[in-house]
Each structure stands twice: as C-alpha cells, then as structure tokens.
Amino acid sequence: IIAARDQWGRTPVVIGKKDGAYAATSESSSFPNLDYEIEKYLGPGEIVRMYPDHIEQLRQPNEGMQICSFLWVYYGFPTSCYEGKNVEEVRFTSGLKMGQMDKSEVDCACGIPDSGVGMALGYAEGKGVPYHRAISKYTPTWPRSFTPSNQEMRSLVAKMKLIPNRAMLQGKRLLFCDDSIVRGTQLRDNVKILYDYGAKEVHMRIACPPLILSLIHISEPTRRTPIS
C-alpha cells in the first residue's frame, strides 16, 4: 500500500503500526479500536510504501507546512491528533486560557455541540464556573449548518439541529463557547433562542480568529459572505 500526503500538508496522513501490519489514515481516531499505535505523521509531499513489517520512504517531505488550522477548531474528531496535537486538548486549552483571562461575570459556561463543547469545558475550569449543557444537538437528520448552498436551508439547519433546555438556562447569565463564526447563521439564531427561553444574559466566546478567506473545494462562503 502506498500512502502520500499533499505537497503543502493541508490535510493529514498518519501511519499506524501493530504486530504484522501498518495502516494509513487521515484521522488517528480510527486506530485505537483496531489496536494500532501512531507510528509517524507524513510530512508535506511525503510518500511511503507500507509492507507488513516495515515502511519504505519513496519521497522525502517538503520543508513548508500549510496545514488547515480548522482541523483542530472544527472538523476534527475529539480523539484525533494532527502533527502530535490532540484535537480535544487544543480546544480545551483555548477555553482554559480564555477563562483565566476573562473578566465577565457569568453563572455558567455552555458549549455549542459538538466542537464548542471542549472549549466550554476548558473555559469553565479556567473561569471557575460550572459547565451546563443548555443546548443539545439532534444529529440523525441535520448536516453542518454552513454547508448547504442557500441561506434559507442554512437557517433551517441551524435552528432545527440544536435544541435548548429551558431548565438549564432560565434566569442564568450564560457564556456560550463556539468554534468559529463563518456566516453568523448559527450565532444569530442561537442568541435569539436563548433569550426566548429565559436567559438573563448571553455572552459568546469564539475559539477561532476571524475567517477572512474561503476554501474552494467545499461549500464554504466566498470572500464576500464571511461575517468578518
């Protein structure tokens, strides 16, 4: 089997090893239940051939790396590691640091599921406030809210897939953590819903810096549409 990574290293390729076998994946979260251990991360442009008992390097890695930071912010599964950095640890640490610095007076921290939860757990620990699950996600039928091609469907998805819990938010000064703001679809609707369900105050903290450019290969916004 030959495994190759793109020349800029924008997406990961991870090699795993167990007795008598090697495997390649883009998500190291696939390894634990198959008894593989991470052997190495391919560098940008690196190519290897895998045999049952060893790896042969066919092309050395390039020096430049332009990995997509959104892997840690949004796309990545919590147990995956990219370039040796675990997704959940990065999200938790960003929230922890923000909570330690934040001077806002809030009653609890909450996360927009799924990728905002790790940040919110870190924020709660850093701030010294409880974590409340005030919004749950209904996953069977709704995709990610930024991927539909038209605004009407994006708004519908953002509204329908997240279900507020009045018992956990009524009368509270809530601080919500989310991974990023792309078009602002989810943020706008969530804030309104939280007030409608009785929140006293709604504060938001975002893990990702402003998005200023788009990806050309998926249904993300053009330069004109990001909220930033």
Task: State what each model feature region is.
Residues 1-116, 124-166:
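N-terminal segments that mediate ammonia production and transfer
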Residues 10, 19, 44-45, 169-173, ...:
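Active-site lining segments that contact anionic ligands and/or coordinate catalytic metals
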Residues 85-86, 163-165, 176-183, 223:
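Short, contiguous acidic/charged loop-to-helix segments that flank catalytic cores in large enzymes
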Residues 102, 148, 167-173, 189-198:
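ATP-dependent adenylate-handling active sites, centered on carboxylate activation for C-N bond formation
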Residues 109, 116-123, 127, 131, ...:
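Extended, hydrophobic alpha-helical segments in both membrane/secreted and soluble proteins
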Residues 192-219:
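A short, conserved beta-to-alpha structural element at the edge of catalytic cores
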Residues 216-228:
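Single conserved hydrophobic/aromatic residue that forms the stacking wall/gate
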